[in-house]
């Protein structure tokens, strides 16, 4: 029987060999954390390689994602559908083993990591989801949700500011099933960290309210085993296990040096490591005995079967709860969702209200949350401004309301957004979280990661323009809406009234293949009249709100607007119409959605032969030239805002009927 060290060495040599074959990669972390991984995966991790999506599996997150060959080796050795050929294709085009772990490629990879600090933050989201789901569904004698979240992280993750945001909140919420392993090797890309990272990490995490197990020898299986047992025994606090490790362990000449962090070791050094660790096998060769000891398929199938029996007993005792649990973990919307949400939208159209779109957003949350117990809302300490609370909101605390549906994220925009991604990845919830649009800048990379991972995270942004007013340019978004529109696979909405706001929320809820950004105003907006056809076309991202005639060829001019500027466009159209100009007004709440429509529909809204166009939006002007062309004009922002009442700012920056009419006449 192979020893623990030999089992860990299988990880080390698969990692060395794959990085060497790829001619790039990071061998140091997998070699340094191999002993920790061997103990965790073989002695504790509850998982089934034959079903990577088992609802009650433990979650494992590699926050230091550059060490991706660690998780690929673990998945391969444990019996997941990841072959030795897949490992040989490490970092190659269209392989299942990209340079950093990517969700949706190798089965068993729970989240995309690489941007340091986001993995530990996703893990906090996973742990929140587990705890909340357990309190919502578990009943005495029926614990159908009962799993841990394990995360590996390194010095880089702890240096990133987002780790403070996430770990602070994790301690406050008492996430007892979150267990983190800190790869304390004192090395980063630039060398030994003594020159730039001398924090007392133990005291830092104790101050957060974590249970900390310090000074564990990361190459001593017995110490690691005991540390995990202690961590599991502490159920009221998250645990940080500080593992002293040697980066590149087993490399005679490069271990404990940044030389092995982010580059292949080289053939000579790998040969020396083989001799040093007494590994007599060829590259990518693993003895059958080691494969047999690593194989977790049978153990995993037994564990899942036992859980299925628990679920069957639960279904017998609580049939309605069991059906609801199954619906939610399968990410299915309620049977009455489509009809009820559409009825709400039609009710709004029939009952006009000139309200701020942030208030319209709150009304949509109120209506939809009653249909969607899977909603898990929140705000970055701006609930009274973002208007994210509804009558049934139940804020989650460490002990009270552990079965709640709302998270007070505090002033943690980046942390909130990456936590939401973890919640979405875990399953059972649709997370939404809000802040001012200006502060999406703090969270931009987490929004991008949601889009990359195709997760249904709903990012809510209010106070969307110079309409914010007196708080001034530090708080007034200019380029942010366009920046969001440019993120691939993110659908961004900027609705013009309560109806478009409700449609935007509905579209975001129904979109399973990616996130949405919902952008709302501080100021009141006039509701637009619509026919049934126009109402149906709102969901297409752009539609003709004002016709000048039935003939497609008739417009002299097209005005395109979003959000608070749609009313301006309609008023300008009336002025021009009175002067004999035939004007079409297009409301385009989501350029991303509109661009996905078929060519015939897009042509029906924006006929290519009508080149006289003006776009109006209180955001950066440059974005709109793709719609107005060289002959068109844009009424937009080309500078930062100012501190003044909103009406003065709109006049100052040209968002007036008079200026729109003047711009239009200049091209007619």
From Swiss-Prot:
GO terms for biological process: pentose-phosphate shunt. Homodimer. Its cofactor is Mg(2+); Ca(2+); Mn(2+); Co(2+). Substrate binds at residues 26, 261, 358, 385, 463, 471, 522. Catalyzes the transfer of a two-carbon ketol group from a ketose donor to an aldose acceptor, via a covalent intermediate with the cofactor thiamine pyrophosphate. One of its GO terms (cellular component) is cytosol. It comes from Pasteurella multocida (strain Pm70). Thiamine diphosphate binds at residues 66, 114-116, 156, 185, 261, 439. GO terms for molecular function: metal ion binding; transketolase activity. It holds the Pfam family Transketolase_C_1. Belongs to the transketolase family. Its EC number is 2.2.1.1. Gene3D superfamilies: 3.40.50.920, 3.40.50.970. It catalyses: D-sedoheptulose 7-phosphate + D-glyceraldehyde 3-phosphate = aldehydo-D-ribose 5-phosphate + D-xylulose 5-phosphate. This is Transketolase 1.
């Amino acid at each position: 029987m192979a020893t623990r060290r030999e089992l860990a060495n299988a990880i080390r040599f698969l990692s060395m060999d794959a990085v060497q074959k790829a001619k790039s990669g990071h061998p140091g972390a997998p070699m340094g954390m191999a002993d920790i991984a061997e103990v965790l995966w073989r002695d504790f991790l509850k998982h089934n390689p034959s079903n990577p999506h088992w609802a009650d599996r433990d979650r494992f997150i590699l926050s230091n994602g550059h060490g991706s060959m660690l998780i690929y080796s673990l998945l391969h050795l444990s019996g997941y559908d990841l072959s030795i050929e897949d490992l040989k294709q490490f970092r190659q085009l269209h392989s299942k083993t990209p340079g950093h772990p990517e969700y949706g490629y190798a089965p068993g990879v729970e989240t995309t990591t690489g941007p340091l600090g986001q993995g530990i933050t996703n893990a906090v989201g996973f742990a929140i989801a587990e705890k909340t789901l357990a309190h919502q569904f578990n009943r005495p004698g029926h614990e159908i949700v009962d799993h841990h979240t394990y995360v590996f992280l390194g010095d880089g993750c702890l240096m990133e500011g987002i780790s403070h945001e996430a770990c602070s909140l994790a301690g406050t919420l008492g996430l007892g099933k979150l267990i983190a392993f800190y790869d304390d090797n004192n090395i980063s890309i630039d060398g030994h960290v003594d020159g730039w990272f001398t924090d007392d990490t133990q005291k830092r995490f104790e101050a957060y309210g974590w249970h900390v197990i310090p000074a564990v020898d990361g190459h001593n299986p017995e110490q690691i085993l005991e540390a995990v047992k202690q961590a599991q025994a502490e159920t009221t606090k998250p645990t940080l296990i500080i593992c002293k490790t040697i980066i590149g362990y087993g490399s005679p000449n490069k271990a404990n040096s940044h030389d092995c962090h982010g580059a292949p070791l080289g053939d000579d050094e790998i040969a020396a490591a083989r001799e040093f660790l007494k590994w007599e096998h060829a590259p990518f060769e693993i003895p059958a005995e080691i494969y047999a000891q690593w194989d977790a398929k049978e153990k995993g199938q037994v564990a899942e079967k036992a859980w299925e029996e628990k679920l069957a007993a639960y279904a017998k005792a609580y049939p309605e709860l069991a059906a609801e649990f199954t619906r939610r973990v399968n990410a299915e919307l309620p049977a009455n969702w489509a009809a009820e949400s559409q009825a709400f939208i039609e009710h709004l159209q029939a009952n006009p209200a000139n309200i701020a779109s942030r208030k319209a957003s709150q009304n949509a949350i109120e209506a939809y949350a009653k249909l969607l117990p899977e909603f898990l809302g929140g705000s970055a300490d701006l609930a009274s401004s973002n208007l994210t609370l509804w009558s049934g909101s139940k804020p989650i605390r460490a002990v009270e309301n552990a079965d709640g549906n709302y998270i007070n994220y505090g002033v943690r925009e980046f942390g909130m957004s990456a936590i939401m991604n973890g919640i979405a990845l875990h399953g059972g919830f649709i997370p939404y979280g809000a802040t001012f649009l200006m502060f999406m800048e703090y969270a931009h990379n987490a929004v991008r990661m949601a889009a990359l991972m195709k997760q249904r995270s709903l990012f809510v942004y209010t106070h969307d323009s110079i309409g914010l007013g007196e708080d001034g340019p530090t708080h007034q978004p200019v380029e942010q809406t366009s920046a969001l529109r440019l993120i691939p696979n993110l659908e961004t909405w900027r609705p013009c009234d309560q109806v478009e706001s409700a449609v935007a929320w509905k579209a975001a809820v129904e979109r399973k293949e990616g996130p949405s950004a919902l952008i709302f105003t501080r100021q009141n907006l006039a509701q637009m009249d619509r026919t049934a056809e126009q109402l149906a076309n709102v969901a297409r991202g752009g539609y003709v709100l004002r016709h000048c005639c039935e003939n497609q060829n008739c417009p002299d001019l097209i005005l395109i607007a979003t959000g608070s500027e749609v009313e301006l466009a309609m008023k300008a159209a009336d002025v021009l119409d009175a002067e004999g100009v035939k004007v079409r007004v297009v409301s385009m709440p989501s350029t991303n959605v509109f661009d996905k429509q078929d060519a015939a529909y897009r042509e029906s809204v924006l006929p290519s032969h009508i080149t006289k166009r003006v776009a109006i939006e209180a955001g950066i002007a440059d974005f709109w030239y793709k719609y107005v062309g060289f002959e068109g004009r844009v009424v937009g922002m080309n500078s930062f805002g100012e501190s003044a009442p909103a009406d003065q700012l709109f006049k100052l920056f040209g968002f007036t009927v008079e200026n729109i009419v003047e711009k239009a006449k200049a091209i007619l």
